[in-house]
From Swiss-Prot:
Name of the molecule in the record: Antistasin
Domain of life: Eukaryota
Tissue and organ expression note: Gland cells. It is more strongly expressed in the head than in the gastric tissue.
Family according to the record: Belongs to the protease inhibitor I15 (antistasin) family.
GO cellular component, one term: extracellular region
Keyword Cell inner membrane: no
Signal peptide: 1-19
InterPro entries (alphabetical): Antistasin-like, CRIM1, Hirudin/antistatin
Residue intervals of the Antistasin-like domain: 21-46, 54-79, 91-117, 120-145, 154-180, 183-208
Matching Pfam families: Antistasin
Keywords for this protein: Heparin-binding, Protease inhibitor, Repeat, Secreted, Serine protease inhibitor, Signal
PANTHER family named among the record's database cross-references: CYSTEINE-RICH MOTOR NEURON 1 PROTEIN (PTHR46439:SF1)
Length: 220
């Protein structure tokens, strides 16, 4: 009986010893760790990327170059930058500027500060003005809204005998003219940051214009 107990104890010790893994020395970097053998010990083979389930989120955007992806390889609602798009340039125009400007510096068309003081203070207003803000004597925006422009009365189209399938053309005041519209009523659920592509008739389509190329300009 004692021999049987000793034999079982030794067997358990051997099994336990075999379960311990030797420390491997692999001269390789595995981003997702190492593969394991049947004993659960690491071996010198890289594990594959773990599968991640991406959400079936729908983006109401048109991206000519496709969508960006996150760290898990899932698409996100951001467009890839075009290969033709010029890289953004760093602003370095204030290196030699010794001026102190209370209201900050004037910025150029590229958004870079110039060595020139701004006349206007930083504009802060919690009022939304649908027709724009009034400006002061220096041309700076104020927190007063412009009045709505007076609506011009439109002439009656009783004398117009035309039937227009797509409706009538409207002038700059929004008044109908006795002229047929070539374009159908435009309906599109895609927002185009740089406007919509137009067809051969000059009518808007539900395709977005590409981002315009920027010139490679240095800010000075």
């Amino acid at each position: 009986m004692n021999y049987l107990f000793v034999f079982l104890a030794l067997s358990a010790a051997v099994t336990f010893a075999n379960a311990e893994c030797n420390k491997i020395q692999c001269r390789m970097f595995c981003k997702f760790g190492f593969q394991q053998d049947e004993n659960g010990c690491d071996i010198c083979k890289c594990a594959e990327r773990p599968e991640k389930k991406c959400s079936n989120r729908y983006c109401k955007m048109l991206c000519p170059e496709g969508f960006q992806v996150d760290a898990n390889g899932c698409q996100i609602c951001r467009c890839k930058r075009s290969a033709l798009e010029a890289p953004e340039k760093k602003c370095d125009g204030l290196k030699q500027c010794k001026m102190h400007c209370e209201n900050g510096f004037v910025r150029d068309e590229n958004g870079c500060p110039k060595c020139e003081c701004s006349k206007c203070k930083q504009f802060q207003c919690l009022i939304f003005c649908p027709h724009g803000n009034e400006v002061d004597e220096n041309g700076c925006k104020t927190c007063k809204c412009k009045a709505a422009p007076e609506k011009k009365k439109c002439d009656d189209l009783k004398q117009c005998r035309m039937f227009c399938e797509n409706g009538f053309v409207r002038d700059e005041n929004g008044c109908k003219k006795c002229e047929c519209n070539k374009c159908k009523n435009f309906i599109c659920q895609i927002f185009c940051e740089y406007g919509n592509v137009v067809d051969e008739n000059g009518c808007k389509t539900c395709k977005c214009n590409s981002k315009p190329l920027k010139l490679s300009l240095h800010c000075r």
